[in-house]
């Protein structure tokens, strides 16, 4: 992906483009560098550019994530490692119609992603997701609080 096409020619994007190019071509014969991989940079960029709100209610947690231009079938909601909520999707560029060319392209295309570590009381078996007007709402129900243990009485015997 060339950031210059999108009108992004800042030094930050130039460096990012250079890092991605290095990762794709293996940076020549020097395999000892510690540059991040292209997929890591892409995921980090997607996470930084995907705004989200997290709310806590008495019985649930609600994650609201902007997913503009995506249909519900284009969005993936997963739980990994029992407590990591992963939300991702990808907005593809609209196909150009014959005779039309972009003069300016400002709407975001590419990967949208967020990861959240769920609290211990999150019920990962009770998760629902609804996408409406470009906003995804993921509701994670809370587990009921553990019942307090009742004291156990031990009978003392006389020896």
From Swiss-Prot:
Q: Which GO terms describe its cellular component?
A: cytoplasm
Give the matching Pfam families: HSP20 (PF00011)
Q: Which residues form a coiled coil?
A: none
- Which terms does the record give in the GO molecular function aspect? unfolded protein binding
Report the principal subcellular site: cytoplasm
Q: List this protein's GO terms for biological process.
A: protein complex oligomerization; protein folding; response to heat; response to hydrogen peroxide; response to salt stress
Domain sHSP: where?
Answer: 43-157
Keywords of this entry? Cytoplasm, Stress response
Membrane spanning stretches: none
Source domain of life? Eukaryota
Subcellular localization is given as: Cytoplasm
Q: Which SUPFAM superfamilies match?
A: HSP20-like chaperones
Question: Which protein family is it in?
Answer: Belongs to the small heat shock protein (HSP20) family.
Name recorded for this polypeptide: 17.9 kDa class II heat shock protein
Phylogenetic lineage: Eukaryota, Viridiplantae, Streptophyta, Embryophyta, Tracheophyta
């Amino acid at each position: 992906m060339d950031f210059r096409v999108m009108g992004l020619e800042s030094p930050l994007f130039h460096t990012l483009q250079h890092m991605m190019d290095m990762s794709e071509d293996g940076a020549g014969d020097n395999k000892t560098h510690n540059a991040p991989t292209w997929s890591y940079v892409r995921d980090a960029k997607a996470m930084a550019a995907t705004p989200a709100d997290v709310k806590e209610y008495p019985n649930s947690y609600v994650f609201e994530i902007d997913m503009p231009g995506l249909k519900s079938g284009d969005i993936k909601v997963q739980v990994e490692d029992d407590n990591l909520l992963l939300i991702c999707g990808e907005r593809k560029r609209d196909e150009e119609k014959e005779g039309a060319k972009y003069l300016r392209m400002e709407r975001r295309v590419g990967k949208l992603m967020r990861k959240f570590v769920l609290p211990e009381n999150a019920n990962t078996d009770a998760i629902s997701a609804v996408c409406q007007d470009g906003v995804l709402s993921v509701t994670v129900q809370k587990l009921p609080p553990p019942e307090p243990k009742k004291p156990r009485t031990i009978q003392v015997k006389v020896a």
